[in-house]
Amino acid sequence: MALVVQKFGGTSVADADRMREVADHVKRTRSRGDDVVLVVSAMGKETDLLLRLADEVNEEPPGREMDMLITAGERKSIALMCMALEAAGVPADSFTGSQAGFQTDGNHGNAKILSVDPHRVRDSVDKGRVAVVAGAQGMSTDNNVTFLGRGGSDTTAVALAHGLGADACELYTDVSGVFTTDPRVCPTAKRMESISFDELLEMTAVGCPKPVMRSVEVARAFGVPLHVRSAFTWEPGTWVLEEAPDMERAIIKGIVPDTSQAKVTLSLSLIHISEPTRPERIE
């Protein structure tokens, strides 16, 4: 029996149909004998909608109130996800970031995790239930709700996996893993079965979008195995490990295209470089 943390992004829980599919997937995972903890993001474009509403009310809203507003999207998701799980016959409990034991600094809008004490999540799992945790949020040391920033749900999942001693952290997205290059640019790009943390961080730094760099850094620091998978095909994705088990280590693992840069080459043969003038000797 394994303990698996599964994170689902906004597109994966965008509507009721998607939530029912996720609930069915969790049910299949549990049927194999595994315990499951879910981390979910806000539904679809919910965060963008909340940001627009805030801007309509106040062009310079206070950071504390923005965090209170934005994190409401994830709280909506965890409640609905638990309802979908219960409808599928899977007992579940929802937890906000603070209820799950996430303590952060007070940097509203981009808070950093200071510690995680997930004893309530562990108690739920030990009772045979699925714990559903709101991503990208916590509680500051002065007891204010905080938002971890964009991509914070991935970081939540990795930190929670470490805190629980989980066997793996599965990040479900709208792509089926990490590819040798951008499949939108090169349709023949191959999905990699495994890649090392260092290799993925290198690709992320120059444009590879998922999973976000911050979560990979946390996973590498604490040795949390990541499994990047598709929430739409459910097929095996890409394992991200300390060392990828290649039979023969590839010299080039992947290529990240960057259309935002241009290269200008100047030929020295076309450039006249004057000889430096020497000062006249003073007698």
Give the role of each language-model region:
Residues 271-283:
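Single conserved hydrophobic/aromatic residue that forms the stacking wall/gate
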